[in-house]
Design a protein with these regions (language model features):
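Flavin-dependent oxidoreductase catalytic cores
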Residues: 1-414
Length: 414
């Protein structure tokens, strides 16, 4: 049996194979952050395609802190019945589902929320300052409230029938902002030393663990590096991985980058050593290193394109799961094909509109794939040749209309 086809168990949940869909922003929810039939259609397509596990796109824990329009928000049990339908889609086809819980912190476009908050009031680089405003530093009480929100959202996810959650601690979102010395300038218990900067993540994990059952899976997505000068050091990264592993985390997904240095979207020049390129995965070298320090399951996402490369990564022991994201946006049956020995069919090329100020941002990658997700959710086939420029213009038109009408910030409990 191929390595990728072998089942594996975490707590009481068996994953039928080693392929996990990495989180990608769906942007399919309505203005009130509610999931709908498009989510059911999209995840049903992946489940029917043999996927072992799907990690959802960002699900926000606070309606007033959304990273983009169309994001799902879980604050209350308002949408419990719809969430149950979503969870049932996976169970019908034996696909595990982990809801990715997140808070964007400062990483929110201007005009989307009334204000942005972060560990510290650190502005974005000049290149992105026109799109993202300077945040307000969180108070101690607000930090505790956000921790409770993560726990409450996880509780609701379990009640709905999902097998677990993933805490988004990468890509420059709030947990990542606490971890990085570039965005965390605090001098209290939440900042300073790496132990203090890790405190928020650990407190979120502990709160989620206490709010859910022993069989509920808790994963976290962490950066191997943020690829910014003065950012978190490798020594500190290893410390974070060890701390969350010792706390009892079940699965760590290894990623990297932020909106200011978007390695997660494949936007950086490829400076990996030749041996890593030959083995495909962006973060496999780091996985091999961190494997010596942690006992939990590891997942590497980014760059896998051949069955041989995936099987080799699993056989090496560097990781337990293969994360695949963008190829699944244009090949919903990819998992079945991989297990049958066929490689990724479509080469995933950088998404370029021809507009320099747009193309330098990771957001273009996100919205192009979101357009594919909408088509899949409607029962249509994805289109690998879809024009990025047309997608961007439609996205910009829709967002400007939403902000002008004031519907994005309409306050209804989620």
């Amino acid at each position: 049996m191929s390595q990728i086809a072998q089942p594996i168990t975490i707590r009481n949940t068996t994953f039928k194979n080693r392929i996990i869909k990495g989180a990608m922003s769906e942007a399919l929810a309505n203005y009130e952050g509610q999931p709908n039939d498009l989510h059911l259609g999209l995840y049903s397509a992946w489940a029917k395609g043999g996927l072992g596990c799907a990690i959802t796109g960002n699900v926000m824990v606070n309606f007033e802190a959304k990273n983009e329009p169309g994001v799902v928000v879980i604050e209350t049990e308002r949408d419990l019945e719809r969430l149950k339908e979503w969870a049932a889609v996976g169970k019908q086809y034996g696909m595990v589902q982990l809801i990715q819980l997140s808070h964007p912190g400062r990483q929110c476009p201007k005009g989307l929320n009334k204000e942005t908050v972060a560990p510290s009031a650190v502005p974005f680089s000049p290149a992105l300052a026109t799109m993202f405003g300077t945040p307000r530093a969180l108070t101690h009480e607000e930090i505790l409230d956000i921790i409770k929100r993560f726990a409450n959202a996880a509780r609701i996810c379990e009640k709905a029938g999902f097998e677990g959650v993933q805490l988004h601690g990468a890509h420059g979102y709030l947990i990542s902002q606490f971890l990085s010395p570039l965005t965390n300038k605090r001098t209290d218990q939440w900042g300073g030393s790496i132990e203090n900067r890790t405190r928020f993540l650990l407190e979120v994990y502990k709160a989620v663990r206490e709010a859910t059952s022993e069989s509920f899976i808790i994963s976290v997505k962490l950066n191997s590096a943020d690829f910014q000068r003065g950012g978190i050091s490798e020594e500190d990264v290893i410390s974070v991985f060890k701390a969350v592993d010792e706390a009892g985390i079940d699965l760590i997904e290894i990623s990297g980058g932020t909106y200011e240095a978007p390695a997660m979207a494949g936007a950086k020049a490829d400076k990996r050593k030749a041996s890593t390129i030959a083995r495909e995965a962006y973060f496999l070298d780091f996985a091999e290193k961190i494997r010596q320090h942690v006992k939990c399951k590891l997942m590497v996402t980014g760059g896998f394109r051949t069955v041989e490369g995936m099987n080799a990564a699993l056989a090496s022991g560097a990781c337990d799961f293969i994360g695949i994201a963008r190829p699944l946006a244009v090949e919903t049956d990819l998992t079945d094909r991989l297990i049958a020995g066929q490689d990724v069919r479509y080469a995933v090329k950088p998404i370029k509109t021809g507009l320099p100020f747009v193309d330098k941002m990771a957001i273009m990658e996100i919205i192009w794939y979101a357009a594919q997700f909408k088509a899949i959710g409607q029962g249509k086939k994805p289109n690998p040749k879809l024009s990025p420029l047309i997608v961007f213009l439609n996205y910009a038109k829709g967002n400007i209309k939403a902000v002008v009408q004031g519907r994005v910030n309409s306050r209804k409990s989620a």
